[in-house]
From Swiss-Prot:
Name by which UniProt lists this protein: Carboxypeptidase E
Role, per record: Sorting receptor that directs prohormones to the regulated secretory pathway. Also acts as a prohormone processing enzyme in neuro/endocrine cells, removing dibasic residues from the C-terminal end of peptide hormone precursors after initial endoprotease cleavage.
Organism for this UniProt entry: Macaca fascicularis
Subunit structure as annotated in this protein's UniProt entry: Interacts with secretogranin III/SCG3.
Record's GO cellular component terms: extracellular space; transport vesicle membrane
Amino acid sequence: MAGRGGRALLALCGALAACGWLLGAEAQEPGAPAAGMRRRRRLQQEDGISFEYHRYPELREALVSVWLQCTAISRIYTVGRSFEGRELLVIELSDNPGVHEPGEPEFKYIGNMHGNEAVGRELLIFLAQYLRNEYQKGNETIVNLIHSTRIHIMPSLNPDGFEKAASQPGELKDWFVGRSNAQGIDLNRNFPDLDRIVYVNEKEGGPNNHLLKNMKKIVDQNTKLAPETKAVIHWIMDIPFVLSANLHGGDLVANYPYDETRSGSAHEYSSSPDDAIFQSLARAYSSFNPAMSNPNRPPCRKNDDDSSFVDGTTNGGAWYSVPGGMQDFNYLSSNCFEITVELSCEKFPPEETLKTYWEDNKNSLISYLEQIHRGVKGFVRDLQGNPIANATISVEGIDHDVTSAKDGDYWRLLIPGNYKLTASAPGYLAITKKVAVPYSPAVGVDFELESFSERKEEEKEELMEWWKMMSETLNF
């Protein structure tokens, strides 16, 4: 027993050392209180979930606490730093954290893009705590999700803005203070405007996806992009995300692409090629939120125009046009489908309401996460079984393609129906397959592509066989 206990202690010490930069964060935090001081915890934890606002040091503490209690299925990493130097922290939950497992889809939640929209930040901390708790209890739904999905949770994309907003006196925070990053940049207007490119391509012909392919260097050199924006762009391009949601505040609705209107008007329904699945994804969130899906809910503010809202969902352009948003950037630069969820009429509501927001959104957060296992999935390989990366998977009738990841794995979100899928890659013969797609789970469809060189060799052998047969027949 002593030996086993010693090994456990060594493991714990190693874990603590590995995250020392996290545990010692408060001393490094700009404007942090003196070492050893902690803000008074006003609310009690319930089942391991702390229903309170977490300042930057406390956010770190909360994530580290989750990790230390389930190191086998989690890790903490950072995608970069904010303008003021705070780390953009992510907690990952997976049965093999830190590794992309071939065939396993990647999911992300992002909160607090606008620093004064605080509910999403807290809900994502609560979600990480909830997933840990339920996994340890053996909750079958949660265990299956963590074993079949690589889940990335970023509670705050704008920690500088949150600290500014949280420092405002009183319970009611200003509607705008802390919205932007420390440079005064609205992060949800700061992404490359790929909508304008795809709208031109729709008319003149051109690619309908991966519009920033091989352009990381250009992104890094763009002085108009905030450091937070650049960090997320790299994140999106480095990991083969399939599904994502961006959590905001100020209304109650699940918003789907396109966010920017085609004509440039302020309000115009702007459908993407995947309008049907995006509507379904948005409803998968809103339908489990009683306040969001209530058709008789009055507008958040007296003069708000909610006429575009249907069952707690809206097309982005129909609500109001947003150029340079992160939602459309995901869809047009990568394989990732993202919606934007507005969680609360108040942007920074009183702390004692956080538990109610969690109860209203818990099932929605899980339901939306489960949507990643819809549609079609599989591998693209050559005839020798080698993976083909960056193969194109197109769906007849939907003018938006996805591509395979480095292991040849791909995922294509679709609503139920009958489809024709075509896999193609440079130097290979394309293959088309018919597939019937249920609501869930995703149907497995693999493709084996024959290279042109293999086909030429095969045709050469067939010609030689034909010549041999003709020679024998005619006694040449």
